[in-house]
Amino acid sequence: MTRQSFDAIVIGGGLVGAAIAYGLQRQGLATLLLDEGDIAFRASRGNFGLVWVQSKGLGAPHYQRWTRGSAQEWPKLAAELKERTGIGTGLQQPGGVHLCLSEEEFGKRGEYMARLQREAGNFGLEYRMVRGAEARDMLPGLGPQVVGMSWTPYDGHASPLYLLRALHTGFTGAGGTYQPNARVEGSSAAPNDFSVEAAGQRYRAPRVVLAAGLGNADLAPRFGLEAPVRPERGQILVTERTQTVLPMPTTTIRQTEEGSLMLGDSKEDAGFNLGQSPEVMRKIAQRAVLSFPWIANLNLVRAWSALRVMAPDGLPIYDQSERFPGAFTANCHSGVTLAGTHANRLAPMIAAGALEPGMAPFSARRFNVRSAA
Ligand SMILES: Cc1cc2nc3c(=O)[nH]c(=O)nc-3n(C[C@H](O)[C@H](O)[C@H](O)COP(=O)(O)OP(=O)(O)OC[C@H]3O[C@@H](n4cnc5c(N)ncnc54)[C@H](O)[C@@H]3O)c2cc1C
């Protein structure tokens, strides 16, 4: 007989749900992971793969710390997944750069990084603004139009698809139950007692985690939560494999383990339209060629668009229901970067039954000025 009662149900099998489900199952909670399937919007299958720190958390030091914490957790998570599943995530953390193609961009970037460092306070933020010959030593093949770059030691990249596969394999390997093609339709909520209907089955658990990406906007109110997320489109281009080695990723260009270059990615307000546009693709390619002129010799072999999961202020939303204790939600636009904290820090909080007080700034109550006051 199909099991119908669990310690926790996670709705959404993308990077966020899979990392949390993996963390919960590893903590010993019998966990069910429900995923809608290929017809859903799935950011986790179309992203760029950066494990990125240096552009995160301006004006939100709690997010800066959370992101950096995740970059620190990543090597542990990658090693553990490799050991448990045999799947390598391709993690490399050689540091990373943001390239500036004009003096104006360089000046603005310098101010941005200085402010980020001030806001980091005692936590600190190591970075350098690098110019000229030094920049060209660090990244051979830089184009003459590159004026300089910001560098931090924390940045890196990984394969998002291998990560997703490793999390799923690690989850089921630890005894978790994964149910694909199972869109949650009906549900009922009471404190520490939830039931959801998916694929003709009804499941119950004292904990439920909403990690359905853009689907959270509809699901959250049913569990006494808010997840006002909207789509933001990003387009990505991929070149053929090349033997030229890019020693570290930049904000918009990274080399996969297999040798392809990924070029990206745009930030567009296009609703739920998953189309691609030649103008945006041209801009992405032009900037890549100005950054590294040798890229012009490579053929493009693939291109796609995907939808980010964006909160109104661009920061993650982590929340717990006051009305229905035991219900949680997790939403973010950096699910690769944050996989480390989702599996190793957030999942243990959910397993313990409550988010730590330090997570309060991530609550969706920040959008509701009266209740936040
Ligand atoms: C172009 C682009 C580039 C990006 N680059 C990076 C990057 O370099 N680094 C980084 O860290 N992040 C990046 N991201 C962001 C990252 O991809 C997302 O943060 C992450 O994928 C979000 O994961 P998720 O699990 O919340 O959402 P999704 O991947 O969208 O998964 C949600 C899942 O929920 C399921 N679902 C929805 N509704 C229901 C329902 N009712 N019942 C059951 N299941 C449901 C869907 O089937 C889906 O699988 C990028 C995103 C885009 C679009």
Language-model region placement:
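Active-site substrate-recognition segment that forms the wall
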Residues: 19-26, 36, 47-51, 86-92, ...
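Short, well-ordered coil/turn residues at beta-beta hairpins
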Residues: 12, 198, 211-212
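Dinucleotide-binding Rossmann-like beta1-alpha1 core, especially the glycine-rich loop
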Residues: 49-134, 138, 287-289
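Helix-loop-beta segment of a Rossmann-like dinucleotide-binding subdomain
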Residues: 87-101, 126-174, 266-270, 325-332
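N-terminal Rossmann-like FAD-binding beta1-loop-alpha1 element of flavoenzymes
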Residues: 6-33
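C-terminal catalytic lobe of FAD-dependent flavoproteins
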Residues: 292-373
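Helical element adjacent to the flavin cofactor pocket in flavoenzyme catalytic cores
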Residues: 150-206, 215
